[in-house]
Swiss-Prot record:
Full protein name: Flagellar hook protein FlgE
Keyword Zinc-finger: no
Higher taxonomy: Bacteria, Pseudomonadati, Campylobacterota, Epsilonproteobacteria, Campylobacterales
Biological source species: Helicobacter pylori (strain J99 / ATCC 700824) (Campylobacter pylori J99)
Disulfide bonds listed in the record: none
Keywords: Bacterial flagellum
Amino acid sequence: MLRSLWSGVNGMQAHQIALDIESNNIANVNTTGFKYSRASFVDMLSQVKLIATAPYKNGLAGQNDFSVGLGVGVDATTKIFSQGNIQNTDVKTDLAIQGDGFFIISPDRGITRNFTRDGEFLFDSQGSLVTTGGLVVQGWVRNGSDTGNKGSDTDALKVDNTGPLENIRIDPGMVMPARASNRISMRANLNAGRHADQTAAVFALDSSAKTPSDGINPVYDSGTNLAQVAEDMGSLYNEDGDALLLNENQGIWVSYKSAKMVKDILPSAENSTLELNGVKISFTNDSAVSRTSSLVAAKNAINAVKSQTGIEAYLDGKQLRLENTNELDGDEKLKNIVVTQAGTGAFANFLDGDKDVTAFKYSYTHSISPNADIGQFRTTEDLRALIQHDANIVKDPSLADNYQDSAASIGVTINQYGMFEINNKDNKNVIKENLNIFVSGYSSDSVTNNVLFKNAMKGLNTASLIEGGASASSSKFTHATHATSIDVIDSLGTKHAMRIEFYRSGGAEWNFRVIVPEPGELVGGSAARPNVFEGGRLHFNNDGSLAGMNPPLLQFDPKNGADAPQRINLAFGSSGSFDGLTSVDKISETYAIEQNGYQAGDLMDVRFDSDGVLLGAFSNGRTLALAQVALANFANDAGLQALGGNVFSQTGNSGQALIGAANTGRRGSISGSKLESSNVDLSRSLTNLIVVQRGFQANSKAVTTSDQILNTLLNLKQ
């Protein structure tokens, strides 16, 4: 009888423990990161009366044992580490673990390690990240000397998590020092089409000849100390933005005055012949052999082929006057007056080699060494020099072919508006006649007339270029251009507005210049303009991808005490790719331009990412990884010892803590501005209370029943 009594008592005690556990679960229904527990019931040792026996060979069956249980007990409380709900908060230092893992905290600044799922953290007055109970959160902290201004932007968002754990502490007055720009990257298109959407006047050139040092585009100072650059005429545009597209040998004629020749005509009864400008002219004299009839006949014969020679004949007293105004488009046969074969008969006074050359052909060539002796040009400087040279020779035939510029009375420049300008500046030399300029197109059987080029130069046409009078100017010549700007930072954190200007210099060639504000200087700048770097080169492939560029970097001296020279790499794209600059038939446009420098900044705000990295936002717009919260996981989470205050400690049955970063090694992710709620399910807990209550009541009934039977036994004695 006593066994039943004590079994009931044991049952009541076990259910009392279960009631305590479930009540504790319910009490912590709103405790952050709390994990509920349950009681594990086991039966007590049984009292064996008979053991079980096996069947006998004589046929007697086997028998089960005869044993009586001695009640129930609780051998363990099991913690259930299922995921709690994640709740949003307004606190940036609140953290929640989604998945396995525990935050690592220390009550003694790192000597002892405890663990928690409660991520309700805050910064104390010294900048330490702590729990509400004052335990310091551990992880990895960025080296104090590593301010992120040496590595890449990606490195700035990472913390070295391979070292030993530290207490997470962030200086609330942290300052990020300035980082000098050492790289400019750019994505843009430079228009390769026939029509330029963005143009600018070609660079001004003075009337002083300069010899290119590199055979391409020299940079030199004019009298006004403005940097000058000679440009490829084949890459230029007219003032409407239409590309000239000069092909090899295309060009113009420039006549500086009408060609003239006066000759006596001999009376003759014979046939007369003459070859002018390569065209044969012949006539048979009238039967009357007077000089007058010979003049008229000669004039009529020459004028009959004017469309082939450009020459018109006039009667001037008893002489024949030939004149070519050089106004017709065409080849050499229509220009000047040249006796290409001596005359006979009435033309006997026309000798082989007689000529009056006042019109000059200027033809474009792609060669970097054009032959000036035959009127070839490539750059604006080549054409300017040719026009100036020939204009002075025509005006003053006494000048030597290699005369000095100082001896010239006619100056040709390209003005600030991109126009070729001719000025008959000498008003003292009155014995020299004025010029009469006319521009016409050049064409031949193999070369077409470039009308755009001719029309742009026809602005030079003038009735008379008077000494000391007004100048004559062509239309405006432009180059395709594109410009963009970006602020670069020096080592002191000072901004400098750097402007990059691109201009087309050839079919697939672009040049660029870089300008920084004074007193800053660029290595390679001229003495007059040290803040301007000229001569950058870009070459594109026939698919519009970048083929190459030079130079690949700039050297900048801010002239304000900052480190110098500051080397800035120009990351304009990879060769053969479309990841930077391109040149296709599309408007010129900058899609993106970036540099990697920044000014000094104060720490303004913090936040955590999913890896537990503490990111600091600074007043300079930069973000820097300041620290990373560590996580620990265990082979057996249920083996951890609860210490109260939402804190656990490691035990022999939990296994060693496996420490690492979030999202690695079975460790979960971390959510900022969130907390993990208790995983207690009230409906389950309240149901369990009813079950425990019924169990307790049933066991109490066993006690009262046993008591009643004992009373019955006592009554039997009476």
